[in-house]
């Protein structure tokens, strides 16, 4: 029996915004649940999301490849930590394996989704016009999707080449050029080693250093690749790695300054720093962070410290104050002549920064949040019915792809239950969202995430991005916090509520 015949009604239309890990994961879960009227939108011209756009030299993941992939589609990875091209190839293969390409509309920038109270569906807007109506909308836009380019004085006067690392200009030949990298995060620390053998001079401007730990990345041996061709073997490796990471983050202990786990992590990072730069006390001082371990996202790299010892690499431990026609002036007033200026300044850390969402009674989601992003399980917001946020508030942490799989299961089960109830919409109850947020914030209290200079905090100082524990605890909550925390209604928001007297169906129950 198909889901459609069981519902005894039309297959609901579902719009998914974004064709990266989040959007693809949600689409596959919904497709496997029996839904066919799924449309995926992406402003890019192909699948991959972040890994379609971020094609900078040296781009690779920080997470082990066996975890940075879907559990239901293992892959014969070439490395322990895969590079951008192979990861983008993987996501493209997933799209084709599940026949999603025909449902993808690439090169379409969705500006807004607007809830129609009477029809109980969303109007999908692109280019100022409605291009589709959908009963449900799943956002796979993510948190870090809109590049942040600082408005530096004199930037427009620069006569060289300038671009953001997430918008890499492959037409520019960096051979023999004087290259400046602004930033000191994960991308910047990948760029320095990658460019030092090409550019004449690489100058990195680091306003504040990060704790750095070794990645231990390497190519898999032929024997390892042969073993990992077995889905069972890869699942065992995946689960072992997942449990090890989960145990380290249990109860947020790793992120609590003064805890045994946090002290050990910081001591390990400090030892790695000092041993890598032994004999260079000035450099050691320049790259030693002043914040507790976890106060900013730790950087994972095997090659950065060694690159700093190269003759053509210069670290400037000051921010860029001004840009001139032929270079930059740092905060101390020193001028540095450069030919190419690469902004490795991250992204606008704002949920749904590229998407406007209008919910019940014409409310804007960004106005509703008012700079204080929050969501039930990171997925649903009161008064925004039939709308789901993948990788939403307080879901960053643990293992991202595993979290996304859990979220996709929640979305699929919630939609299935709504259709079985013949509900026109489902939304989280306000009291449930409030209680959930209070509990999460209490769990986050006292962690290094409260450090002032990071992207974890909202305008009010509340920690808006991080999940305080591991994947397992989050997974349990996505299975348990269903009914009665959700409200199913048969018509408009004023219609009688369908009482969910049974839990939402388990995955595979169709």
Go through the PLM ranges and name each one:
Residues 4-11, 21, 25-46, 139-271, ...:
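Rossmann-like dinucleotide-binding core of oxidoreductases
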Residues 6-104, 207, 275-279:
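Beta1-alpha1 glycine-rich phosphate/pyrophosphate-binding loop at the start
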Residues 17, 132-144, 180-182, 328, ...:
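Short hydrophobic core segments
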Residues 75-93, 257-263, 292-303:
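Short beta-strand to alpha-helix junction loop
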Residues 79-144:
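Feature captures the FAD/FMN-dependent oxidoreductase FAD-binding
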Residues 87-104, 297-322:
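Helical element adjacent to the flavin cofactor pocket in flavoenzyme catalytic cores
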Residues 106-120, 316-331:
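A conserved short coil-to-beta-strand element within the FAD-binding core of flavoproteins
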Residues 211-214, 226, 374-375, 386-510:
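C-terminal, flexible cofactor-proximal segment of oxidoreductases
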């Amino acid at each position: 029996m198909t889901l459609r015949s069981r519902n005894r009604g039309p297959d609901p239309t579902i719009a998914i915004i974004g064709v990266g890990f989040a959007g693809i994961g949600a689409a596959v879960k919904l497709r496997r649940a029996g839904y066919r009227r799924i449309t995926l939108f992406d402003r890019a011209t192909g699948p991959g999301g972040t890994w379609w756009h971020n094609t900078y030299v040296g781009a690779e993941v920080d997470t082990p490849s066996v975890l940075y992939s879907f559990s239901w589609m293992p892959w014969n990875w070439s490395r322990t930590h895969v590079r951008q091209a192979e990861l983008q190839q993987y996501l493209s293969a997933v799209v084709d394996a599940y026949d999603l390409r025909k449902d993808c509309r690439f090169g379409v920038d969705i500006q807004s989704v607007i809830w129609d109270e009477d029809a109980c569906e969303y109007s999908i807007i692109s280019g100022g016009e409605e291009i589709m109506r959908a009963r449900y909308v799943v956002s796979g836009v993510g948190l870090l999707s809109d590049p942040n380019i600082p408005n530096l004085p004199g930037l427009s006067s620069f006569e060289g080449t300038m671009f953001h690392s997430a918008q890499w200009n492959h037409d520019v030949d960096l051979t023999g050029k004087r290259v400046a990298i602004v930033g000191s995060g994960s991308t910047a620390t990948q760029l320095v080693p990658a460019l030092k053998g090409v550019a004449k001079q690489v100058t990195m401007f680091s306003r504040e250093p990060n704790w750095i730990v070794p990645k231990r990345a390497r190519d898999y041996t032929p024997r390892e690749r042969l073993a990992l061709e077995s889905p069972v073997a890869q699942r065992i490796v995946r689960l072992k790695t997942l449990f090890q990471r989960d145990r380290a983050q249990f109860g947020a202990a790793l992120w609590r300054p003064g805890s045994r786990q946090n002290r050990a992590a910081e001591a390990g990072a400090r030892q790695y720093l000092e041993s890598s730069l032994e004999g260079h006390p000035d450099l050691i001082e320049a790259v030693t962070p002043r914040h507790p371990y976890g106060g900013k996202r730790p950087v994972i790299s095997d090659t950065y410290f060694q690159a700093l010892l190269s003759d053509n690499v210069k670290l400037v431990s000051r921010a860029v104050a001004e840009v001139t026609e032929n270079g930059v002036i740092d905060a101390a007033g020193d001028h540095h002549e450069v030919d190419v200026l690469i902004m490795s300044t991250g992204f606008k850390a704002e949920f749904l920064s590229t998407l406007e969402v209008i919910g019940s009674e014409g409310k804007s989601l960004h106005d509703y949040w008012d700079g204080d992003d929050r969501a039930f399980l990171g997925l649903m917001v009161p008064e925004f019915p039939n709308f789901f946020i993948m990788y939403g508030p307080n879901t960053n942490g643990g293992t991202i792809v595993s979290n996304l799989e859990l979220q996709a299961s929640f979305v699929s089960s919630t939609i299935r239950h709504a259709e079985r109830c013949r509900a026109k919409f489902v939304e989280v109850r306000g009291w449930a969202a409030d209680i959930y947020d209070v509990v999460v914030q209490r769990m986050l209290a006292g962690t290094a995430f409260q450090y002032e200079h990071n992207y974890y905090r909202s305008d009010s100082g509340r920690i808006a991005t991080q999940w305080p524990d591991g994947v397992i605890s989050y997974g349990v909550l996505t299975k348990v916090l269903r009914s009665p925390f959700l409200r199913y209604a048969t018509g408009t928001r004023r219609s009688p509520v369908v009482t969910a007297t049974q839990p939402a169906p388990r995955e595979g129950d169709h």
